[in-house]
């Protein structure tokens, strides 16, 4: 009966526990590209889009900081490559996630074949406060956080494509993608409780 209702588009609202109570292990996004990617610059564009989506999902889930980034790559020969690494400090900033993911990607993918799929995820969530050092720029981080929140509000109201990364405009097909909105993967617990 519940399956039939869902098939007809009926949506049931329920009280959702906080992310800490749900014990979310990771948040990520991946994409199988419509054509082979042949160089780092093309892969970099997709990684930045994926990282932007992952960071937005983190904020949406109430998980603002992660300590580990994982990158996944699949060649056109369908061979898969994985690498993960720790961030210098816990972060929820898309740029830092993307830069770490690009660095990991460069270490794991040798370009023996063109690239067909990419994925970025974060894990090892951090719920405590951050001890700043005298070299960190707290004002800049606070401005970035407020900017991210403003972008999230605008995207929620007008759709994810309304504000895009400049890098996606290098490829006309990339700017048509709505990675966050069209590629939703629910945790198992979502289906178990509905």
Report residues per predicted region.
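Acidic, metal-coordinating catalytic segment for phosphate/diphosphate chemistry
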Residues: 89-194
């Amino acid at each position: 009966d519940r399956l039939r209702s869902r098939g007809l588009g009926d949506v049931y609202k329920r009280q959702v526990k906080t992310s800490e109570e749900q014990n979310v292990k990771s948040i990520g996004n991946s994409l199988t590209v419509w054509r082979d990617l042949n160089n780092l610059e093309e892969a970099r564009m997709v990684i930045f889009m994926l990282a932007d989506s992952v960071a937005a999902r983190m904020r949406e889930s109430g998980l603002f900081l992660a300590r580990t980034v994982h990158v996944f790559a699949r060649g056109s020969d369908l061979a898969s490559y994985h690498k993960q690494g720790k961030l210098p400090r816990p972060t929820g900033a898309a740029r830092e996630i993307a830069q770490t993911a690009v660095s990991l990607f460069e270490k794991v993918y040798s370009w023996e074949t063109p690239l067909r799929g990419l994925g970025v995820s974060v894990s090892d969530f951090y719920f405590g406060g951050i001890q700043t050092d005298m070299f960190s720029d707290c004002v800049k981080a606070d401005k970035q956080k407020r900017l991210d929140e403003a972008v999230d509000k605008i995207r929620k109201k007008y759709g994810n494509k309304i504000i895009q990364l400049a890098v996606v405009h290098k490829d006309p097909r990339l700017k048509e993608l709505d990675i966050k909105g069209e590629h939703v993967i629910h945790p198992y617990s979502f289906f178990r409780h509905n």
